[in-house]
A protein has these predicted regions:
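Aromatic-rich peripheral "rim/lid" segments of glycoside hydrolase catalytic domains that contact
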Residues: 89-103, 282, 293-389
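Generic structural signal for well-ordered alpha-helical scaffold segments
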Residues: 125-129, 229-230, 279
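Amphipathic alpha-helical segments in well-structured domains
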Residues: 48-51, 158-162, 225-226, 271-275, ...
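Long, C-terminal catalytic modules of enzymes
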Residues: 278, 285-288, 295
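A short acidic, glycine-rich active-site loop
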Residues: 4-6, 104-116, 262-273, 317-322
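Active-site clefts of carbohydrate-active enzymes
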Residues: 30, 144-155, 204-218, 229-275, ...
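Glycoside hydrolase catalytic-domain groove-lining segments
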Residues: 156-167, 171-258, 283, 288
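Active-site mouth of glycoside hydrolases
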Residues: 1-202, 299-302
Length: 389
């Protein structure tokens, strides 16, 4: 979470060796926004140097990388530079963290605020310049679940932002891939920057999904859930899908997590079973690949810090434990890495339905899922409790 400030290339090499040992070939990581851009038009030379080092280590480890810009949203909180904040918050769902402390300020909407958008263009261009042509670079992720920070007022506003950031990257590196991390709530609600808008600049679409966060899933081990989201995303956006976040938090004797989030936590063997089945479903539905969230559990020394203090289940999503030992889920990653992609099958949904999907997105989404699973007349699944983040 704060690795850029406490950067250790040897730790990166150790962790990449573990990842590569499963057969995985790509790693996605976050560029904590305030670490890379301490002032609106100042990009940290030290952070860019660390970024190049990470790419070099990845290349030696035979891994490719997807750096994620403007992070932004992570583990149930929004990490935002002080200069990108303004005013007071209006009943915001997620806490805002700036300078390692929770602040009671709102986020300036970068889709509408020209100064923030220009600063983001600067960051995107300079980061892309730093890795232009690097053999380890797969491409750039234009944000992690950006709609958890702010949303455009109109589709055109969102499209203008996407075009500007994409153009900034491609002005210095025309050969890299682009994507942007959208998530379940971008399907459940019309946030005006969903799959169709993302598809305008993305080489492949990215989707994130967890059955624990959907009241309409069949439960925390609903292995069909992520494959359905991938199919919906491809249908709405018209491009192939790389599923860049799936996973499950596991039981670890953490009393806070058990008390606040017990219904979300799986035993480690159950988590492996879920991951194996979910990744198999993604492969069978034609996804270009799948990335798990996340590499390792958070060390207990930072459990009392935001956001982990109020979202204890976020401490335990790792495929490796905090001490570096692998959970059974790491074996699921190894099994899936050996599989080859299949071509997506045609979906049964009409163009007319697609054109009107966002008239009533959540109702439509739930109905489509229940029909896909043959649950049209079945009793709705019991709602899972979700902790306040």
């Amino acid at each position: 979470m704060r690795w850029w400030r406490r950067f250790d290339a040897k730790e990166v090499a150790r962790d990449f060796t573990r990842v590569r040992g499963t057969g995985a070939d790509i790693v996605r990581f976050f560029l904590l926004w305030e670490d890379f851009q301490p002032e609106p038009f100042t990009v940290s030379d030290e952070a860019l140097s660390h970024l190049r080092t990470v790419a070099d280590v990845a290349s030696r480890s035979q891994l490719q990388v997807i750096p994620t810009l403007f992070t932004g949203h992570m583990s149930g909180a929004n990490f935002i530079p002080e200069w990108a904040l303004g005013g007071t918050r209006e009943r915001a769902r997620f806490r805002v963290i700036a300078g390692e402390r929770v602040v009671d300020r709102g986020i300036r909407n970068w889709y509408a605020d020209e100064d923030i958008a220009r600063a983001q263009v600067t960051l995107a261009r300079e980061c892309a310049r730093a890795l232009a042509g690097h053999p380890a670079l797969w491409g750039w992720d234009l944000g992690n679940e950006n709609s958890n920070c702010c949303v455009p007022a109109t589709r055109d506003e969102g499209l203008r932002w996407l075009d500007r950031v994409a153009d900034a990257i491609r002005s210095v590196d025309g050969g890299c891939h682009l994507t942007i991390g959208i998530h379940l709530e971008d399907l459940e609600e019309d946030r005006r920057i969903g799959p169709a808008e993302a598809g305008r600049v993305s080489d492949v679409l990215s989707m994130h999904g967890y059955p624990i966060y959907a009241s309409w899933s069949a439960g925390p081990m609903d292995e069909a859930f992520v494959a359905f989201l991938a199919a919906i995303t491809r249908w709405l956006g018209g491009k192939d899908v790389l599923f860049t976040e799936l996973g499950a938090p596991t039981q670890d004797g953490d009393p806070d997590a058990e008390r606040q989030s017990g219904a979300m936590l799986l035993g480690e063997d159950d988590a492996r079973s879920y991951l194996s089945a979910a990744m198999r479903g993604l492969q069978q539905t034609g996804a270009t690949g799948a990335l798990t969230w996340c590499f390792a559990d958070y060390a207990s020394t930072i459990w009392n810090e935001p956001p982990l203090d109020q979202a204890p289940h976020e401490r335990h999503f790792g495929l490796w434990r905090a001490d570096g030992s692998p959970k059974p889920g790491a074996a699921a990653l190894a099994e899936s890495s050996a599989k080859t992609r299949v071509e997506p099958e045609p979906v049964p949904w009409s163009e007319e339905l697609r054109d009107h999907f966002y008239d009533s997105p959540k109702t439509t989404l739930v109905r489509m899922y229940r029909e896909r699973r043959g649950l049209k007349g079945a009793k709705p699944p019991q709602r899972l409790a979700r902790p306040l983040l």
